[in-house]
């Protein structure tokens, strides 16, 4: 669960003092910590640069040096928390958001930026794309309506540009719990969402099922990115072909 949403100034991740944020999060850990959870300390906020000390202090105050469950951050689009947080003892894995943007610049950040170049930096941390483009969401930057093909591209790239650890799938109608064809609250720029009970059976969701079956049939934890496998890589990031091989070849 996300512990402190931090998109707007009115949300707890921004509105609460460090002391109160720690108190609230400690309560959440006490209430739910016995379950098999992954703690996402901050949700959709800015955690880098001048903001990093505040979030480090909150993380240390809540989890100390040895959290009983995995802990990470869910940053805003194309923010890399690895540089500021990977050495924190409470920080378990690097979560990032490639986001809902299919411009050349955005895709290049995924396939040539930190997820693809920083994975070997020590101390090593698993790397997970926690928010690639959601199915049937509309990109406010390009106007693209992301379909199942866009879902597959984002998922395979996310799983292969870094050592395979996982990726998430989202649908515009599911994250918002849309009950009819409607525009999600405060998200007008992303377009209308279909009802969640239709969205759960979408083509993209079936693609992710097959992807999970494929990776589950191999020793996915041994995969490492290997760009040399593709001899003629397209010149544009939008057509980038991700490739990986096992450690033993």
PLM segments and residue spans:
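Aromatic- and carboxylate-lined catalytic core of secreted/periplasmic carbohydrate-active enzymes
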Residues: 134-137, 151-249
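Generic recognition of flexible, low-complexity loop/linker segments
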Residues: 26-28, 81-83, 114-117, 154-155, ...
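Short, conserved catalytic or adaptor-binding loops enriched in Gly and charged residues
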Residues: 31, 84-88, 117-120, 244-246
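Proline-centered flexible-loop/turn and helix-kink motifs
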Residues: 33, 67, 123, 216-219
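Short acidic-hydrophobic sequence patches enriched in Asp/Glu that either
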Residues: 20, 54, 147-150, 203
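Catalytic-core region of carbohydrate-active enzymes that cleave or remodel glycosidic bonds
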Residues: 67-68, 88-184
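Active-site mouth of glycoside hydrolases
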Residues: 1-105
């Amino acid at each position: 669960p996300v512990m402190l949403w931090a998109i707007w100034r009115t949300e707890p991740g921004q509105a609460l003092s460090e002391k109160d944020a720690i108190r609230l999060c400690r309560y959440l850990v006490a209430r739910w910590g016995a379950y098999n959870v992954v703690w996402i300390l901050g949700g959709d906020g800015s955690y880098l640069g001048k903001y990093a000390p505040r979030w480090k202090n909150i993380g240390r105050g809540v989890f100390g040096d040895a959290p009983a469950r995995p802990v990470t951050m869910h940053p805003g689009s194309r923010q890399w928390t690895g540089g500021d947080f990977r050495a924190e003892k409470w920080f378990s894995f690097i979560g990032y958001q490639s986001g809902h943007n299919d411009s050349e610049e955005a895709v290049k950040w995924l396939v040539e930026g930190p997820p693809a170049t920083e994975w070997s930096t020590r101390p090593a941390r698993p790397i997970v794309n926690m928010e690639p483009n959601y199915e049937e969401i509309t990109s406010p930057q390009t106007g693209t309506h992301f379909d199942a093909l866009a879902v597959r591209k984002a998922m395979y790239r996310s799983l292969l540009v870094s050592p395979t650890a996982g990726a998430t799938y989202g649908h515009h109608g599911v994250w918002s719990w849309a009950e009819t064809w409607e525009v999600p609250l405060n998200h007008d720029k992303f377009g209308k969402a279909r009802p969640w009970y239709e969205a759960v059976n979408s083509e993209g969701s079936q693609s992710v099922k097959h992807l999970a079956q494929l990776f589950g049939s191999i020793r996915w934890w041994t995969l490492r990115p290997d760009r040399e496998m593709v001899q003629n890589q397209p010149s544009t990031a939008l057509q980038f072909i991700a490739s990986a091989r096992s450690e033993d070849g």
